[in-house]
């Protein structure tokens, strides 16, 4: 687990309290799944929020490329619109299957959704 904020200890989970941009500085083994619920601070300006989300997704994709095992899965939060199109385009050559997920707990008016990459190539 990686977070800039402290986290309660969880059995069998290695936790690194670092900025996401610094994850390449730590020594990690390859993992079977990468989960991300990260999102930028929302400004309320769609274009700015979308660009900020794309910047975070670029970092996440580099983590997937470096640390996710072949055959692994990647689940991440994104916003419908430009950032989702960007993400799907980035993932289509990295995974055999890509699914969009809108959790029941997410408000219908929210642009928040999740993208699941299945079976990393």
Sequence positions of predicted segments:
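Short, well-ordered alpha-helix to beta-strand connector turns
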Residues: 12-13, 31, 64, 71, ...
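Class I S-adenosyl-L-methionine
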Residues: 78-121
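Short catalytic-loop micro-motif centered on adjacent basic/acidic residues
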Residues: 73-77
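Eukaryotic intrinsically disordered and solvent-exposed regulatory patches
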Residues: 1, 61, 100-103
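S-adenosyl-L-methionine
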Residues: 2-41
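Glycine/threonine-rich flexible loop motifs
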Residues: 42-53
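A short glycine-rich, Lys/Arg-flanked "PGG" loop and its adjoining helix->strand segment in the class I
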Residues: 51-70
């Amino acid at each position: 687990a990686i977070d800039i904020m402290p986290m309660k200890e969880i059995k069998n989970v290695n936790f690194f309290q670092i900025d996401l941009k610094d994850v390449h500085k730590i020594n990690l083994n390859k993992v079977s799944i990468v989960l991300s619920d990260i999102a930028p601070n929302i400004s309320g300006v769609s274009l700015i929020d979308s660009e900020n989300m794309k910047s975070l997704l670029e970092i996440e994709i580099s983590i997937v490329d470096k640390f996710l095992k072949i055959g692994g899965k990647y689940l991440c939060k994104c916003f419908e619109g430009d950032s989702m199109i960007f993400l799907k385009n980035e993932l289509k050559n990295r995974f055999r299957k890509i699914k969009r997920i809108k959790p029941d707990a997410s408000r219908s008016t929210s642009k928040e959704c999740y993208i699941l990459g299945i079976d990393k190539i």
